[in-house]
A protein has these predicted regions:
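HDAC/HDAC-like amidohydrolase catalytic core signature
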Residues: 1-117
Length: 117
Protein backbone atom coordinates (compact mmCIF):
# COMPACT_ATOMS: atom_id res chain seq x y z
CA UNK A 1 0.00 0.00 0.00
CA UNK A 2 1.28 3.45 -0.87
CA UNK A 3 1.20 6.30 1.57
CA UNK A 4 -0.49 9.55 0.69
CA UNK A 5 1.70 11.78 -1.49
CA UNK A 6 1.58 14.62 1.05
CA UNK A 7 3.07 12.75 4.00
CA UNK A 8 6.25 10.99 4.90
CA UNK A 9 4.76 9.40 8.02
CA UNK A 10 4.95 5.64 8.32
CA UNK A 11 2.20 5.55 10.96
CA UNK A 12 -1.05 3.92 9.94
CA UNK A 13 -4.66 4.44 10.97
CA UNK A 14 -6.92 1.47 11.61
CA UNK A 15 -10.56 1.31 10.52
CA UNK A 16 -12.86 -0.89 12.58
CA UNK A 17 -16.41 -1.47 11.38
CA UNK A 18 -19.06 -4.14 11.68
CA UNK A 19 -22.68 -4.59 10.69
CA UNK A 20 -23.34 -5.05 14.42
CA UNK A 21 -22.45 -1.38 14.97
CA UNK A 22 -25.51 -0.50 12.89
CA UNK A 23 -27.67 -2.57 15.24
CA UNK A 24 -26.84 -0.38 18.25
CA UNK A 25 -30.34 0.86 19.13
CA UNK A 26 -30.54 4.43 20.41
CA UNK A 27 -34.33 4.19 20.55
CA UNK A 28 -36.69 7.13 20.00
CA UNK A 29 -35.23 10.47 20.95
CA UNK A 30 -36.36 14.07 21.17
CA UNK A 31 -33.24 15.95 22.17
CA UNK A 32 -33.34 17.98 25.35
CA UNK A 33 -37.03 17.29 26.01
CA UNK A 34 -38.68 14.06 27.06
CA UNK A 35 -41.02 12.57 24.44
CA UNK A 36 -44.60 13.48 25.34
CA UNK A 37 -47.95 14.30 23.77
CA UNK A 38 -46.47 17.62 22.65
CA UNK A 39 -42.91 16.53 21.81
CA UNK A 40 -42.57 14.06 18.95
CA UNK A 41 -39.60 11.71 19.26
CA UNK A 42 -37.46 10.92 16.27
CA UNK A 43 -34.13 9.38 15.47
CA UNK A 44 -31.20 10.22 17.70
CA UNK A 45 -28.28 11.67 15.76
CA UNK A 46 -26.37 8.53 16.70
CA UNK A 47 -28.29 6.05 14.54
CA UNK A 48 -27.48 3.39 11.93
CA UNK A 49 -27.79 5.83 9.02
CA UNK A 50 -25.12 8.19 10.37
CA UNK A 51 -22.66 5.30 10.70
CA UNK A 52 -23.46 3.97 7.23
CA UNK A 53 -23.12 7.48 5.81
CA UNK A 54 -19.67 7.81 7.38
CA UNK A 55 -18.53 4.42 6.09
CA UNK A 56 -19.87 5.19 2.61
CA UNK A 57 -18.14 8.59 2.57
CA UNK A 58 -14.82 7.04 3.62
CA UNK A 59 -15.16 4.58 0.72
CA UNK A 60 -16.51 7.13 -1.81
CA UNK A 61 -13.50 9.44 -1.43
CA UNK A 62 -11.00 6.57 -1.39
CA UNK A 63 -9.87 7.11 2.18
CA UNK A 64 -10.39 3.42 2.91
CA UNK A 65 -7.41 2.66 0.67
CA UNK A 66 -5.19 4.46 3.18
CA UNK A 67 -6.61 2.73 6.27
CA UNK A 68 -5.76 -0.60 7.84
CA UNK A 69 -8.94 -2.70 8.05
CA UNK A 70 -9.40 -4.22 11.50
CA UNK A 71 -12.05 -6.62 12.71
CA UNK A 72 -13.80 -5.98 16.01
CA UNK A 73 -13.21 -8.52 18.73
CA UNK A 74 -14.69 -9.30 22.10
CA UNK A 75 -12.45 -8.04 24.87
CA UNK A 76 -12.24 -8.70 28.59
CA UNK A 77 -13.38 -6.31 31.29
CA UNK A 78 -9.69 -5.73 32.08
CA UNK A 79 -9.22 -4.23 28.62
CA UNK A 80 -12.38 -2.11 28.87
CA UNK A 81 -11.13 -0.82 32.24
CA UNK A 82 -8.11 0.68 30.49
CA UNK A 83 -10.44 3.41 29.17
CA UNK A 84 -13.55 3.21 31.40
CA UNK A 85 -13.86 2.99 35.20
CA UNK A 86 -15.68 -0.05 36.60
CA UNK A 87 -18.63 2.03 37.85
CA UNK A 88 -19.25 3.25 34.28
CA UNK A 89 -19.08 -0.30 32.92
CA UNK A 90 -21.53 -1.45 35.62
CA UNK A 91 -23.92 1.42 34.85
CA UNK A 92 -23.99 0.71 31.10
CA UNK A 93 -24.52 -3.01 31.73
CA UNK A 94 -27.39 -2.26 34.14
CA UNK A 95 -29.13 0.09 31.69
CA UNK A 96 -28.81 -2.46 28.88
CA UNK A 97 -30.02 -5.32 31.09
CA UNK A 98 -33.13 -3.29 31.94
CA UNK A 99 -34.03 -2.92 28.25
CA UNK A 100 -32.08 0.23 27.46
CA UNK A 101 -32.45 3.89 28.30
CA UNK A 102 -30.34 6.95 29.01
CA UNK A 103 -26.74 6.12 29.85
CA UNK A 104 -26.11 9.72 30.90
CA UNK A 105 -25.25 12.94 29.08
CA UNK A 106 -28.18 12.37 26.70
CA UNK A 107 -26.69 9.10 25.45
CA UNK A 108 -29.48 6.59 24.83
CA UNK A 109 -28.57 2.93 24.58
CA UNK A 110 -30.54 -0.21 23.79
CA UNK A 111 -30.62 -3.69 25.27
CA UNK A 112 -27.73 -4.99 23.11
CA UNK A 113 -25.54 -1.86 23.21
CA UNK A 114 -23.18 -3.22 25.89
CA UNK A 115 -22.43 -6.37 23.89
CA UNK A 116 -22.13 -4.49 20.59
CA UNK A 117 -19.74 -1.91 22.04
Amino acid sequence: MEFHKNTSSKRRTGWITSELYYWHDTQNWSGLLEPSTTVQPGLHFENPETKRRMQNLVEAVGLDQHLVPLRPEIVSTDIIQLVHPQDHIDKIKKVCDSGGGDAGSMTPIGPASFDIA
